[in-house]
Amino acid sequence: MSENCSHNCSSCGETCASRTMESFRVPLNPQSSVKKVIGVVSGKGGVGKSLVTSLMACKMRARNNRVGILDADITGPSIPKAFGIHGMVGVTADQLMLPRTTSTGIEILSSNLILEHETDPVIWRGPVVGGVIKQFWSEALWKDIDYMFVDMPPGTGDVPLTVFQTLPVDGIIIVSSPQELVGMIVGKAVQMAEMMKVPILGIVENMSYVLCPDCGKHINVFGDSHVDETGKKYHLPVLAKMPLNPEFAKEADAGMIETFAGDYLDGAADAVA
């Protein structure tokens, strides 16, 4: 750090080597309170990250916690649909966004809830997307939230960087699938988290197997799982192995994800708590 550093980061460039992680933090507004922030990430798309986010929120809500979901997948939001939430958010007299509340009391803020029509595409460049995420955090009324889950888009680009730098993330869950290729992709997410000094709570493997409805046998439709060796390689616990279950899609499509009562994520919920 330079001897002449004033610690006033607004007076220097973003590339200044003296900047600290804390200097990028965006504070909550004085009317909001969030105790713990958990990011749900994946190195690639299509592994069920939003499903895991939704089910984790439901699991922690079922344990009598106040739960919120900040949907940071700005260009591909799916959280409101899974919970049956439609329409736009409200605004307080102080011009704070009011997250929509699900049937069980989970608070949700998503780009789909600030659009006039939920099918309208979000065609924004990275800085605009990052600005919206910061607004979802600092310009919304999050009242007494025990656990905030942040559903992030796949990869290691602008949005994860924005979330890690500006939100006080307490830990992340990495979502993967059984294919061996995913092990390499998980490695990228692990290394990014380590570079950003964000704790990794563990790995959740989705689509791990199909449970035969007749004999109960586990069928590895995507081949043998490699999540255990991936976890061992990076010294991370495997928090859950979730099956490829048609009920997930059925209930999410119907906006009734909160009615699912499986125990697949009990271990992940324990790690978060």
Task: Cite the ranges covered by each PLM segment.
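Residue-level signature of catalytic and energy-coupling elements of molecular machines
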Residues: 34, 45, 71, 79, ...
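Extreme N-terminal, non-catalytic leader segments
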Residues: 1-44, 88
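C-terminal lobe/tail of nucleotide-utilizing enzymes
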Residues: 1-22, 190-273
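Walker A/P-loop phosphate-binding motif and the immediately C-terminal alpha-helix
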Residues: 31, 36-74, 190
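Glycine-rich phosphate-binding loops of nucleotide-dependent enzymes
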Residues: 109, 152, 165, 271-272
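Conserved Switch II/interswitch segment of TRAFAC-class P-loop GTPases
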Residues: 143-150, 156-157, 168-189
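Phosphate-binding loop that captures ATP/GTP phosphates
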Residues: 66-68, 72-116, 130
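Phosphate-binding/switch loop-helix module in NTP-utilizing enzymes
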Residues: 115-163
